[in-house]
A protein has these predicted regions:
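Carboxylate-rich, polar loop motifs that coordinate divalent cations or form catalytic acidic clusters
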Residues: 1-170
Length: 170
């Protein structure tokens, strides 16, 4: 479950609980570099490889990894080494994946994408896309929704209600 200010909450089966569930909360811990990078969770997404991604407001994109029963969050501060460095793309609102396995990330600062066929998160090469024009303003880059329709076309909705079709990408 995504929360505003209280981190990420995971529900696990627990037959000893009256509800049959146990809830585990993951919050940012400044002393733990493998903790989630922000407590403001906006979006979670599972890609075609089964990986769980977490979009955060102020914390960018996190990838959940699990080893020996321990959960770790990979992000720009500890494992996504190629993440944009200049302070943009830290408010992640939405994600989708195209039919070629490319993952698209909508942020308040524009669109970001990367090849989902990777073995090591440190090797992910992020590409960024921003609207720049004479009439451009912040709203042109503020992406609310990425939607893949039944024909696998990706649609981009930005602040102010503008809807764009992602036509060509390499």
């Amino acid at each position: 479950f995504s929360t505003k200010g209280n981190g990420l909450v995971k529900a696990e089966p627990d037959m000893n609980s009256p509800q049959g569930l146990r809830f585990v909360r993951y919050k940012n811990d400044p002393k733990n570099p493998n903790s989630i990078s922000s407590n403001d969770v906006y979006f979670t997404y599972q890609d075609s490889q089964g990986r769980i991604w977490v979009g955060l407001l102020g914390g960018g994109l996190n990838l959940i990894s699990e080893a020996n029963g321990t959960i770790a969050f990979k992000h720009k501060y500890n494992g996504l080494k190629q993440y944009p460095l200049y302070g943009l793309y830290m408010e992640v609102r939405t994600m989708t994946e195209d039919n070629d396995g490319r993952i698209w990330v909508g942020t308040m600062d524009g669109l970001m994408s990367f090849d989902g066929h990777f073995t090591n998160p440190e090797e992910i090469q992020f590409e960024t896309y921003r609207q720049v024009s004479e009439r451009s303003n912040v709203a042109d880059n503020d992406i609310y929704v990425l939607y893949k329709d039944s024909e696998s076309q990706i649609w981009v909705s930005v602040f102010g209600g503008v809807l764009n079709k992602l036509v060509h990408y390499d």
